Amino acid sequence: MYKTWRLCRTHTVGGLCHDGSHRFVSTGGAKIGKKFENMNQIRDYLSRPVWSVHEYLGINTKEEKLEPPSAEAVKKLLRLSGLPLEGADIKEIQMRLAKQLSFINKLHNIPVEGEKHTKEYDARLVQRNTKQLNYTKLLEGISHQKQDAELGEVSGSWKATGLAAESKNAYFVVKEGLLKNRK
């Protein structure tokens, strides 16, 4: 689709772009679709539904097929969320939770094109095989960092204890009676 992508910084006054973020710039000439001419075209495009929630809610399925959570689980959820137990329609809440769980299960079962590629960037609660970060790797990573003068970063300019009322040898001084003797 794109020939190449590169990360670049857009510089303006003071070395920062107007929103302080990095921008992606395409060096290729990719065409996605017709260019929008005005805000009405954008609103029309965004208001057109691509898919309906009703497809995945299972409204046509009978309520007997749904497996509602137990009444004890619903009461526990109500207590944990701080909602009142008194006057709560437990049966209605069970059916709503069953429909929501059914919807979530159907979303998880939707086939995704290029699933091998998307698994690397999966944001679901999936265990990832990451390498453990230890103290030596952290120090090694810090040693390779350099300040960017274009962004106004100056090496050694920040002192953590600079605004502290009392400090000694670049450490904060905490007195025992600090919170006890407050007025």
Swiss-Prot record:
It is a peripheral membrane protein. GO terms for cellular component: glutamyl-tRNA(Gln) amidotransferase complex; mitochondrial inner membrane; mitochondrion. Keywords: ATP-binding, Ligase, Membrane, Mitochondrion, Mitochondrion inner membrane, Nucleotide-binding, Protein biosynthesis. Its EC number is 6.3.5.-. The keyword Nucleotide-binding applies. It catalyses: L-glutamyl-tRNA(Gln) + L-glutamine + ATP + H2O = L-glutaminyl-tRNA(Gln) + L-glutamate + ADP + phosphate + H(+). It holds the Pfam family GatF. GO terms for biological process: glutaminyl-tRNAGln biosynthesis via transamidation; mitochondrial translation. Its main location: mitochondrion. InterPro entries: GatF. It is found in: Mitochondrion inner membrane. CDD domains: GatF. GO terms for molecular function: ATP binding; glutaminyl-tRNA synthase (glutamine-hydrolyzing) activity. Present with 172 molecules/cell in log phase SD medium. This protein may be expected to contain an N-terminal transit peptide but none has been predicted. Allows the formation of correctly charged Gln-tRNA(Gln) through the transamidation of misacylated Glu-tRNA(Gln) in the mitochondria. The reaction takes place in the presence of glutamine and ATP through an activated gamma-phospho-Glu-tRNA(Gln). Required for proper protein synthesis within the mitochondrion. Belongs to the GatF family. Subunit of the heterotrimeric GatFAB amidotransferase (AdT) complex, composed of A (HER2), B (PET112) and F (YGR102C) subunits. This is Glutamyl-tRNA(Gln) amidotransferase subunit F, mitochondrial. The gene is GTF1.
